[in-house]
């Protein structure tokens, strides 16, 4: 059980929720200029390594009660030197935080080169359950690509990681899914196909002969899914797992 908790913590820490100091100054200025009546929670920013003249900014805006908090999301691409907005995407009710709590946002600048001219970036979102008996963690990703003054969301809430199970007094079971998003060799509607390569593990938690609480993997499965661009977005299969 301790190992499961460590795994959940490790996955959470893998979500880069801390902004680069080089771009943090723009967060307050953007909030004051465009969202002066609202308070942002867990904003992040990152200078884009693929084009350091541009900076990616994610501004989440919570609203609602403690039981259910809805997050409006403003994703912006700005000029690194001036802070001027180049393109953005505004999405009301983008995410909800309830019994499964939203714990942070991160910016993914992996090489999502969709064609010779278009390169996407990702926004990762982490969720975590509050139960120690039924631990749960999930990480989703959205992908965005610039088109003139707009940032088009082309992948919506693709689940990349899940971890959970049921355990009490060193008895129980667990399951983990860990997926990576890769570029395929083929293209559809001028954008590269995306390969979701997933590894699923299931197992049990028990006391071994030495009285130690250990985990034992009983099943391991690898799968792949291909996402095809339809001219607007990459629709996700149902269910992805």
Task: Please identify what each model-predicted range represents.
Residues 94-142:
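Extracellular-facing segments of soluble proteins and assemblies that are Gly/Ser/Thr-biased and enriched
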Residues 1-8:
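Bacterial N-terminal signal peptides that target proteins for export
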Residues 59-115:
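Short N-terminal edge-element motif at the start of the domain
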Residues 21-37, 138-152, 157-241:
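Acidic, small-residue rich beta-repeat scaffolds with periodic aromatic anchors
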Residues 52-62, 113-127, 188-199:
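Acidic/hydrophobic-patterned starts of short beta strands in beta-sheet-rich repeat architectures
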Residues 42-52, 102-117, 180-189:
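Structural signature of eukaryotic scaffold interfaces centered on beta-propeller domains
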Residues 22-71:
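Solvent-exposed N-terminal domain segments of exported/luminal and surface proteins
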């Amino acid at each position: 059980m301790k190992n499961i908790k460590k795994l959940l913590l490790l996955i959470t820490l893998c979500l880069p929720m801390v902004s680069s100091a080089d771009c943090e100054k723009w967060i307050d200025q953007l909030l004051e200029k465009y969202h002066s009546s609202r308070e942002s929670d867990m904003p992040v920013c990152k200078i884009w390594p693929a084009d350091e003249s541009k900076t990616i900014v994610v501004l989440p805006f919570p609203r609602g009660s403690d039981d259910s908090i809805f997050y409006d999301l403003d994703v912006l691409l700005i000029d690194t030197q001036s802070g001027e907005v180049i393109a953005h995407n505004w999405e009301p009710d983008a995410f909800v935080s309830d019994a499964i709590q939203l714990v942070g946002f991160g910016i993914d600048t992996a090489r999502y080169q969709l064609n010779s001219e278009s390169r996407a970036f990702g926004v990762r979102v982490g969720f975590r359950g509050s139960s120690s008996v039924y631990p749960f963690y999930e990480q989703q990703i959205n992908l965005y690509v610039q088109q003139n003054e707009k940032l088009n969301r082309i992948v919506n809430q693709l689940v990349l990681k899940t971890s959970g199970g049921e355990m009490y007094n060193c008895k129980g079971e667990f399951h983990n899914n860990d997926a990576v998003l890769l570029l395929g060799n083929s293209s559809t509607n001028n954008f590269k196909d995306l390969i979701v390569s997933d590894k699923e593990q299931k197992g049990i938690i028990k006391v071994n002969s030495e009285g130690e609480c250990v985990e034992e993997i009983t099943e391991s499965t690898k799968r792949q899914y291909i996402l095809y661009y339809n001219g607007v977005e990459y629709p996700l299969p149902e269910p992805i797992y």
